[in-house]
C-alpha cells in the first residue's frame, strides 16, 4: 500500500510530506489488468503530476491510460500538482508538456504557470494563451492566501475556451484551517462534479471553491461532505450566514 507521512507545521516551520510508495501495488499496475469496460464507460479520467513523477514505469503507464481513455471518448483532466520531493520543475515540465495535447481540463496554480512554465503577464492572458496552444477546453487556477497556519483565504479562476470567458467569485476569507491536506483534491472534485452534473463552468467553480473551503475544516485528506452541505455553504457564501449553528 502506498502511504505518506505528514508533519504539521507552525510558522515559521513549514509542514512536510514524506512519500513511501516504492513497491506499492499501484507501482506494479499493468494496462491489461484494467477491464476494457472501464475505458468505454468512463466520462472523465483524472490524473495528476504526482502520478507522473512516481517512477518511469508509472509515467509510461499513465501516458498509455490517457491515450486509451481519450480514444474511448473520455474527457481527460490533469492536475499539475507539482511536488519537489518527487522531481524537479524542469523534469516535470518536460513530461507534462508531452501529455498536454491530449488533456481537456487543466488544473494549475498561478505559481506553476510562472515558475514551471516560465510564463509572464496577467494570469488571464497566460491561461488564454495556454488553452490556445494546447487546445485545452478549460483551465482552472486556484489562489490561496495564507494569513497564518490556521487562517487561509481561498479562491480560483476558470477559463472556458469555447466561450473565451473567465469565471471567478469572491474569495472564501479567514477559513479556520484544521487540515489543509487534500483541499486541492477537494477543489478538483468539486469542479469535475460541476462539469459532469451541470455542464456549467461557473457552477463548477462554485462547487470547487466550496469543496476546498470545507476540506480545510476537516481532519484527514478525504473530504467527507454531501451535496446538501456543499450547496448550503455556497448559498451562505453568496448571501451571508443565516445562523451561527446548524440545528
Describe these PLM feature segments:
Residues 22, 50, 81-85, 111, ...:
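Active-site beta-loop-alpha junctions enriched in small/polar residues
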Residues 68-75, 133-137:
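A short helix->loop->beta-strand "cap" motif at the edges of active sites that frequently abuts
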Residues 61-73, 95-102:
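Catalytic-core regions built around general acid/base machinery
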Residues 1-49, 231-247:
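Conserved N-terminal subdomain of the carbohydrate kinase-like
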Residues 51-60, 88, 116-119:
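Glycine/threonine-rich flexible loop motifs
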Residues 86-163:
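Conserved phosphate/ATP/ADP-binding segment of small-molecule kinases
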Residues 76-78, 106:
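Hydrophobic faces of well-ordered beta-strands that scaffold small-molecule active sites
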Residues 167, 171-247:
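Conserved post-catalytic alpha-helical subdomain immediately downstream of the catalytic base
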